[in-house]
A protein has these predicted regions:
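Bacterial N-terminal signal peptides that target proteins for export
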Residues: 2-11
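Cleavable N-terminal signal peptides
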Residues: 13-14, 24
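Mid-chain, structured segments of secreted extracytoplasmic proteins
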Residues: 71-100
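Outer-membrane beta-barrel pore proteins
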Residues: 47-49, 54-67, 106-112
């Protein structure tokens, strides 16, 4: 592994892990719908919010404040259910743990300069399930598990061209870590009953494979009038080279440990446009449209092993997983009401079309949540502001009827249900 790249990877994920042990879980595919409590309370409609969401639009960095410190956490509760009959039967709930996703932000305007510089650390999202007692197609009981963590370190700069127009750019340093179990205690010689003939099923345990990649984001913020703001942003794809972990395969004759690499995984490119409109001094409406290119980023993932710890016939195994995700369009709407004494109420709705094709649906990657209702609250005093938000995702059920066991080892009636879930956000800011 490249030393400099591995140091960056472990630094980013290490800082996040101190605050967020366990699994990240998300709602627009693998992404959180919002970047901070205000954004989340407004349903993720955030690209035209000045000074409050530089992670989504670098042109909004800092706003009117000279210095801004912000930080917070999201508490996530992802209830997922897996059912099948043909290769089961199973009716299993993923362990209902509560997970923590943090963010930290610093912005500093350079004296009277039009430049503002900042640094953001953000647990972007990920995915996680843990089924510890699943009946396999062989009749035994085994485990399904995924823990995918995604974090970004984001150096950011914005430039105020004039009173109406601001431009921004950021370097997106993405770090990913993944662990997965696919029936690790199970082995089958396949339909022909001949071990090593090519149709064997081998149980898999992938441990601590990770890596770092780089992307860029550009943003524009424009005040059309005293009431109307527009925002536009574009994020390039982050190619991630993932290695440094272990691949353990159950080959029937023995459990063999390999050095592991994973290729074919990326964080998607995105484009977003949005508006913020002050209906009155006490009432704001926001709306965004966001395009996420999961089709290019999450297609086929290959896990490759090397340097086995035992002398076995399979020296360099390759396991390919077809995911075939689709492009996703996300629509976000929000409203913000200013009450007396600087109390603010927020409401939002977020709809993201399901990017996961049913024929490649897997209980390991339940990324098919579509609709979310949100509620938020904000209060400011002196130089501080406190923001809270609640996200409620609506139930979504999907069934994989793909009869090909090489692409769907869970049977042609496997159903994954993401039950109604909740995310709580808490954030505190200090501006001067």
């Amino acid at each position: 592994m490249n030393y400099r790249r591995s140091v960056t990877h472990f630094l980013i994920l290490g800082i996040v892990a101190m605050l967020a042990p366990g699994i990240s879980y998300s709602t627009n595919g693998m992404n959180m719908i919002g970047y901070n409590p205000r954004s989340s309370g407004l349903g993720g409609a955030d690209v035209a919010l000045e000074g409050d969401c530089p992670a989504c639009n670098p042109a909004t960095l800092g706003g009117e404040a000279r210095v801004n410190f912000s930080g917070g956490v999201a508490l996530l509760h992802p209830p997922v259910n897996f059912q099948n009959g043909f290769f089961g039967p199973n009716d299993a709930d993923s362990d209902e743990n509560i997970y923590v996703a943090p963010y930290l932000e610093y912005a500093h305007r350079l004296n009277d300069s039009p430049w503002t510089l900042g640094l953001i650390l953000w647990a972007q999202g990920g995915m996680g399930v843990d089924y510890d007692d699943v009946r396999t197609f062989t009749g035994s009981r085994d485990e399904l598990y995924t823990n995918l963590q995604i974090a970004r370190l984001i150096p950011t700069a914005s430039y105020r061209v004039n009173d109406r127009l601001s431009l921004g750019a950021s370097l997106q340093i993405g770090a990913v870590n993944m662990q997965s179990k696919l029936f690790p205690e199970t082995y089958s010689a396949g339909p022909d009953g001949i071990p090593g003939s090519g149709d064997d099923f081998v149980g898999m345990h992938l441990r601590d494979v990770g890596g770092t990649g780089y992307a860029g984001r550009l943003g524009v913020f424009y005040r059309v009038s005293d009431r109307l703001n527009l925002g536009i942003t574009y994020l390039s794809e982050t190619n991630i080279r993932m290695d440094g972990g272990q691949l353990m395969l159950n080959l029937g004759i023995a459990s063999v440990t390999y050095k592991a690499k994973l290729k074919g995984f990326a964080l998607p490119r995105e484009a977003e446009i949005g508006m913020s409109y002050m209906v009155s001094p006490m009432f704001r409406l926001v709306a965004d449209i966001r395009w996420i290119d999961w089709a290019s980023a999450v297609d086929e993932v290959t896990v490759r092993g090397s340097q086995p710890n035992l002398a076995v016939p399979i020296q360099t195994p390759e396991l390919t997983f077809k995911l075939k995700w689709k492009e996703q369009w996300v629509y976000a709407l929000g409203a913000e009401f200013v009450l007396k004494r600087k109390h603010i109420l927020r409401f939002g709705f977020n709809h993201g079309a399901n990017p996961v094709p049913n024929s490649y649906l897997s209980p390991l990657f339940p990324g098919h949540v579509e609709q979310h209702l949100t509620l938020g609250y904000g209060h400011s005093w002196n130089r501080f502001s406190l923001d809270l938000a609640w996200e409620h995702s609506l139930k979504n059920k999907a069934t994989n009827r793909n009869p090909n066991p090489a692409e769907n080892p869970f049977g042609p009636d496997s159903t994954v249900t993401v039950n109604p879930g909740n995310v709580l956000h808490l954030g505190l800011s200090y501006r001067f």
